[in-house]
């Protein structure tokens, strides 16, 4: 549930051409020592920024021919190595400037204005226009965005709401553990080897559904009712149909009646229908029982009772939060388990930290979350090496100068998250998975931007962080995570960065006393 929560973080602009002939080599791509522009104090023109930007359509064709769309992240690393810490690109009609050094976003974010604007997902806005539905806060801009965001911040991202979320998310985490124990028992081998991607998808959807809608979908059960299964299918179909429409205008697909557009509409209809059912259930519960016994009813019910946003505004924003908080969170957890399986000694360090926190707090989960810095560092390290989004973007509202280059107002500027995570000038030994690097006291400013920054940072950040931390606590307390083979898994771009092949993990129960 990170920067989209997903799409909040997903880069939808297309990096410049120059894709290496091989899809990738066996080693992890690392940014080499970046080139620097002329050190003179003379500010250079926008047209002097290096890069491939003079023929956008030719670049688009070359990019498509070289399968660059699935390798956007590696292309960006290649381009930073070729052009230096700043370069300009034009792919089709997308014209942008790309930056990599952590001191650069400080300048960028100062120029984002009162109403920060980033690229929107045209497929999502096209559906809402087609169905005459309101935009949620993820897709809004201007004063309408700001007024909605201020209200939602208090209910979703304020530190004060953490106590509301923890009991709900902790319950889902415990149910996931129980589900894994059942899988191990049924295997008859005292272990369970599987690709966890679908299980983690269900876990993430159950978690975010519990917090947002205040009800369980039942995805941790062996039998999933048809209504919940349809909801899962709609979420999956929505993501599957979004990615191709990044490159083909949805309006054109709608005019020709393309199946991908019809499927996209069907998927969103199902997602919004789920929100409608939840709203009806909430009103029914409020009429029947005014005493909630102190239990947090969920974000949707809280916003309805607050009565500061219209029902349609609430439904739109909550639906976007839910849609953006599934794949992003589940993929980050999958990469984290993958890295812990590759580093068993580190896994034991995290397990020991969790054990100390459990003993010190007598199991008070809210207090435990304050005592697991290495676990939190592991999640930051995962987002450094395996970010869900390729880049973080802003349209600047004033002229700025970066690396002695003038960048005019209105330009789309992108910070390469994937590339920065592999820059040895920013992260020593970038190829190493080292959660301890986040425990240091030196300046880490603008180095961990997986959830974005400033007023337009990921709205679901508090939910996502809590959900992932609780998941790791429960998994570390109950299972040892192993990998079958020492095979390195790379990323591929499909709206977000995903493992390019299944990650097989083996879960073994910890024996009593371990």
From Swiss-Prot:
Documented EC number(s): 1.14.15.6
UniProt-recorded Gene Ontology molecular function terms: cholesterol monooxygenase (side-chain-cleaving) activity; heme binding; iron ion binding
Root EC class: oxidoreductase
Single Gene Ontology BP annotation: glucocorticoid biosynthetic process
Entry keywords, A to Z: Cholesterol metabolism, Heme, Iron, Lipid metabolism, Membrane, Metal-binding, Mitochondrion, Mitochondrion inner membrane, Monooxygenase, Oxidoreductase, Steroid metabolism, Steroidogenesis, Sterol metabolism, Transit peptide
Keyword DNA damage: no
Pathways involved: Lipid metabolism; C21-steroid hormone metabolism
Location within or outside the cell: Mitochondrion inner membrane
Gene Ontology CC, one term: mitochondrial inner membrane
Tissue specificity remark: In the ovary, not found in early vitellogenic follicles, barely detected in postvitellogenic follicles and abundant in post-ovulatory follicles.
Pfam family, one: p450
Binding of heme, residues: 458
Presequence positions on this chain: 1-39
InterPro entries linked to this entry: CYP11_CYP27_families, Cyt_P450, Cyt_P450_CS, Cyt_P450_E_grp-I, Cyt_P450_sf
Annotated PANTHER family: CHOLESTEROL SIDE-CHAIN CLEAVAGE ENZYME, MITOCHONDRIAL (PTHR24279:SF3), CYTOCHROME P450 (PTHR24279)
Family: Belongs to the cytochrome P450 family.
Stated role: Catalyzes the side-chain cleavage reaction of cholesterol to pregnenolone, the precursor of most steroid hormones.
The protein, known as: Cholesterol side-chain cleavage enzyme, mitochondrial
Organism from which the protein derives: Oncorhynchus mykiss
């Amino acid at each position: 549930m990170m920067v989209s929560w997903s799409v909040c973080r997903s880069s939808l602009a297309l990096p410049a051409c120059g894709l290496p002939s091989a899809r990738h080599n066996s080693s992890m791509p690392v940014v080499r020592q970046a080139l620097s522009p002329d050190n003179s104090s003379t500010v250079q023109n926008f047209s002097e920024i290096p890069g491939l930007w003079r023929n956008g359509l030719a670049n688009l064709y070359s990019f498509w021919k070289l399968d660059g769309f699935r390798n956007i992240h590696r292309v960006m690393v290649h381009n930073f190595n070729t052009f230096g810490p700043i370069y300009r690109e034009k792919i089709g009609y997308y014209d942008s400037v790309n930056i990599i050094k952590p001191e650069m976003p400080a300048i960028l974010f100062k120029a984002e204005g009162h109403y920060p604007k980033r690229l929107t997902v045209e497929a999502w806005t096209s559906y809402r226009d087609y169905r005459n539905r309101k935009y949620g806060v993820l897709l809004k801009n201007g004063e309408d965005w700001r007024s909605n965001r201020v209200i939602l911040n208090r209910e979703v991202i304020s530190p004060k709401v953490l106590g509301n979320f923890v009991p709900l998310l902790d319950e889902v985490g415990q149910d996931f553990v129980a589900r894994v124990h059942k899988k191990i028992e049924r295997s008859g081998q005292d272990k369970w080897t599987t690709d966890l991607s679908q299980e983690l998808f269900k876990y993430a959807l159950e978690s975010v559904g519990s917090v947002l809608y205040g009800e369980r979908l039942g995805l941790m059960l062996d039998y999933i009712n048809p209504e919940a299964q349809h909801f899962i299918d709609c979420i999956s179909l929505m993501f599957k149909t979004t990615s191709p429409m990044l490159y083909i205008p949805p309006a054109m697909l709608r005019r020709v009646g393309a199946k991908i557009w019809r499927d996209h509409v069907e998927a969103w209809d199902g997602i919004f229908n789920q929100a409608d059912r939840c709203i009806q259930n909430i009103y029914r519960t409020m009429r029947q029982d005014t005493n909630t016994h102190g239990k947090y009813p969920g974000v949707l019910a809280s916003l309805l009772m607050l009565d500061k946003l219209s029902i349609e505004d609430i439904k739109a924003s909550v639906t976007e939060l839910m849609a953006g908080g599934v794949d992003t969170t589940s993929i980050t957890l999958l990469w984290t388990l993958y890295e812990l399986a590759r580093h068993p000694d580190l896994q034991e360090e995290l397990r020991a930290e969790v054990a100390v926190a459990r003993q010190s707090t007598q199991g008070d989960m809210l207090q435990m979350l304050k005592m697991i810095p290495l676990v939190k560092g592991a999640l930051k390290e995962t987002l450094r090496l395996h970010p869900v989004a390729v880049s973080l973007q802003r349209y600047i509202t004033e002229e700025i100068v970066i690396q002695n280059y003038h960048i005019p107002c209105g330009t789309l500027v992108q910070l390469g998250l994937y590339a920065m995570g592999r820059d040895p000038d920013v992260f020593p030994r970038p190829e190493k998975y080292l959660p301890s690097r986040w425990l240091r006291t030196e300046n880490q400013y603008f180095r961990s931007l997986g959830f974005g920054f400033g007023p337009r940072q990921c709205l679901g950040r508090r939910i996502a962080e809590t959900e992932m931390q609780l998941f790791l606590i429960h998994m570390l307390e109950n299972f040892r995570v192993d990998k079958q083979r020492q095979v390195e898994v790379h990323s591929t771009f499909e709206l977000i960065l995903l493992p390019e092949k299944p990650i097989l993990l083996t879960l073994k129960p910890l024996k009593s006393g371990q």
